[in-house]
């Protein structure tokens, strides 16, 4: 990750280890229901100029009867974003997080987006002692098999 600081027409570029800065870098987080078909276009066209972090929600913004459709739309959103990043040289994409309902869904979603490099991490709702082990084990499984996902 590079940070560019502009001061009095001078630029200072600093390389920063993403893992060190990530806990402090999320900033304002925009939520969007995963069922929306315009998320990729919104990101690609930079509809929100200063969008830095985006949570694509599969949890309480999605009715139970629409979860499967929302998961399919999420996979399509990531497919479009991957294609744009590869072919249109789209840069400066926001950090992308997916808010899941369960540890099982976390793994299913990760597989459906084929471990997209555009995914920054997951938001684990209602995380507590009753589900902590399941979420942690799911993340360990992903992180063992691929790159680090937060």
What are the residue ranges of the model-derived segments?
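Expand to "…catalyze enediolate/carbanion chemistry for C-C bond making/breaking, isomerization
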Residues: 1-150
